[in-house]
Each structure stands twice: as C-alpha cells, then as structure tokens.
C-alpha cells in the first residue's frame, strides 16, 4: 500500500471535493429563496431534488462508460460536468437554469462516485478496503462540515455590503 499513498491521497481529495460541492446546497437554499423571491417553498425543494435525481439517473450509465472508455475519461467528465453546470448558471442566473445546473452538477458527482468506489478498492488493496472506505467517508464528513463554514465566510466577510443578517439560519448560527 505504501507505493499507492499518493494516489490514495488524491482519491481522498476527490471525496472531499464531492462532499464539499454536495453539502453546500443546504446553506444556499435560504439565499436562493430570497434571491429568486420564491414564495412557494416547494420550488426550493426542487433544487436538491434535481441534484439527487441526477445521481439516480447517471450511476448505471457511468458504470457503462467506465467499462467502455476507462476511469480517466469518466473522471475527467465527472469534474467537467460541475464546471459546465456552474458556468451555465453564471451566464444565465434564472431559476430554470439553476435547476438545470443542479442536475448537470449532480450528473458529474454521480460519475465521480462511480469511478472512485472501485478505484479506492484497487489502490488501497482488497485487504485494506474497509479502512480505505472509512477514510473516504471521514473525508466526506470533514468536507460536509467545512463547506457551510466556507460559504459563511464568503458571504459574511468578503461581501458585507450585500449580507443581510437574519436571512439564513446556517450563516447566522
């Protein structure tokens, strides 16, 4: 396992990134509600729904893509999809584009998870798989804790002019 520590560290970093992106959705919801003036809160519920439906849709096709093209191209596409989704929303910041963007980002996250699960088994070794899987979940947990804090910092400290106290329970707590 010593010769694969670098690759295993890279895989753990990927899990961190996946969790960071996935878990920043929660703190964003109140700001999205106020930013888009959503009066029907069910509309806000569509945001994570679109994100996670993409997981369900893309998991099996991602496995087929891995079998056909290999891990590297699917891993690259898995990182490219969130980039594309983010750029699309930045260029057209509308509610429908937000939903489409969340869906595209979710597709990428599903591709990444589908690549990383078997890859961490191969890199960490069959005999160490339980440890490696738990280490991946630990990294996932750390990122899920840190991502709202980073969002809080960005909103409160970097742009105090537009920050409105009391609008977001995640930021104000």
What do these predicted ranges mean?
Residues 70, 91-96:
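Helix-breaking motifs and short loop linkers at transmembrane-helix boundaries and internal kinks
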Residues 130-155:
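Glycine-rich segments within core transmembrane alpha-helices of 12-TM secondary carriers
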Residues 111-125:
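Intracellular juxtamembrane helix-capping segments at the cytosolic ends
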Residues 80-93:
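C-terminal ends and interior cores of transmembrane alpha-helices
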Residues 46-64:
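Central cavity-lining transmembrane alpha-helices of secondary-active solute carriers
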Residues 6-38, 117, 147, 151:
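Extracytoplasmic
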């Amino acid at each position: 396992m010593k010769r694969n520590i670098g690759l295993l560290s890279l895989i753990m970093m990927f899990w961190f990134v996946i969790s960071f992106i996935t878990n920043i959705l929660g703190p964003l919801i109140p700001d999205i509600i106020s930013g888009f003036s959503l009066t029907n809160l069910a509309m806000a519920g569509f945001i994570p729904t679109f994100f996670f439906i993409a997981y369900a849709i893309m998991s099996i096709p991602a496995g087929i893509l891995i079998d056909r093209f290999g891990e590297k191209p699917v891993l690259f596409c898995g990182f490219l999809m969130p980039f594309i989704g983010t750029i699309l929303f930045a260029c057209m910041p509308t509610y429908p584009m937000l939903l489409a963007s969340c869906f595209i980002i979710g597709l990428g996250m599903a591709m990444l998870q589908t690549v990383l699960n078997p890859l961490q088994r191969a890199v960490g070794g069959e005999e160490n798989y339980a440890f490696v899987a738990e280490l991946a979940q630990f990294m996932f947990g750390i990122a899920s804790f840190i991502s709202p804090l980073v969002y809080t910092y960005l909103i409160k400290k970097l742009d105090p002019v537009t920050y409105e106290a009391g609008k977001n329970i995640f930021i104000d707590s």
